[in-house]
Curated annotation (Swiss-Prot):
This is Large ribosomal subunit protein bL12. The keyword Ribonucleoprotein applies. Keywords: Ribonucleoprotein, Ribosomal protein. The gene is rplL. The keyword Chloroplast does not apply. GO terms for cellular component: cytosolic large ribosomal subunit. Homodimer. Part of the ribosomal stalk of the 50S ribosomal subunit. Forms a multimeric L10(L12)X complex, where L10 forms an elongated spine to which 2 to 4 L12 dimers bind in a sequential fashion. Binds GTP-bound translation factors. It comes from Methylibium petroleiphilum (strain ATCC BAA-1232 / LMG 22953 / PM1). One of its GO terms (molecular function) is mRNA binding. It comes from the Bacteria. HAMAP family: Ribosomal_bL12. Belongs to the bacterial ribosomal protein bL12 family.
Length: 125
């Protein structure tokens, strides 16, 4: 049976909140899935001494200041993050802010380089 996606969305649009809740529960039961948001596992607290010796593998890219060429910095932020124009502008206007979080060192260094080339002041943390 072919079911048109647009017809399905129209049917969903006409449902009440209670009906949508029942639909979610039925889908969970039918397919054995959960609609709960996936959470990242918490880090274990047992290896404190070993963790201090290991090299840091995840970095945050922090935009410190937009500089004089704000438009170029906004474009660079959009390329790096995939944010929309308004969101990227808000991020740049609210500096200092994290542009990217928990990324590999090479990716973080490339992101900082791109921001600096656009005229911003950025750093790794």
């Amino acid at each position: 049976m072919a079911f048109d996606k647009d017809a399905f969305l129209t049917a969903l649009d006409s449902m009440s909140v209670m009906e949508l809740n029942e639909l979610v529960k039925a889908i969970e039961e039918k397919f054995g899935v959960s609609a709960a948001a996936m959470a990242a596992p918490a880090a274990g607290g047992g290896g404190g001494a070993a963790a201090a010796v290991e090299e840091k593998t995840e970095f945050n890219v922090v935009l410190l200041e937009a500089g004089a060429n704000k438009v170029s910095v906004i474009k660079a932020v959009r390329e790096l993050t995939g944010l929309g124009l308004k969101e990227a502008k808000d991020l740049v206007d609210g500096a200092p802010k994290n542009v990217k979080e928990a990324v590999a060192k090479a990716d973080a260094e490339a992101a900082v380089k791109k921001l600096v080339e656009a005229g911003a002041k950025a750093e790794l943390k």
